[in-house]
Amino acid sequence: MSQAESSAAGSGVSANELDPEDTKIVVLARSTRARIGAAEGAAVRDTDGRTYAAATVALPSLRLSALQAAVAAAVSSGAPGLEAAAVVNADGSEPDAEAVAAVRDL
């Protein structure tokens, strides 16, 4: 996990301690969550430096964590791999294992 991922997942690293690129994905995750009032917001950065943000998807026929949705956006855009991820939620809990596995898969 990158420092940004750990920070947003509740490791105690503040956004002030991150480099500017990692701070950017934390801000993207936070603003994505706030924009629609979602339970969770996430952002990922691919190995080309492009960023993808998403919020929790909670439809009757489709459920994705914000991190899974952000990874799906990256994959569907042709991202070759991921170098960082951030997750922001109301309770400061860490992302579930399936969501983290999606990051590692790419």
PLM regions and their residue ranges:
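C-terminal binding/interaction regions
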Residues: 2-35, 77-106
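N-terminal first-folded block
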Residues: 20-53, 58
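Residue-level detector of alpha-helical recognition elements and their boundaries
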Residues: 44, 63-64, 85
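Charge-rich, low-complexity amphipathic helices
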Residues: 50-51, 71, 92-96
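Short, glycine-rich nucleotide/cofactor-binding loops
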Residues: 56-63, 91
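A short, polar/charged loop-to-alpha-helix boundary motif
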Residues: 60-73
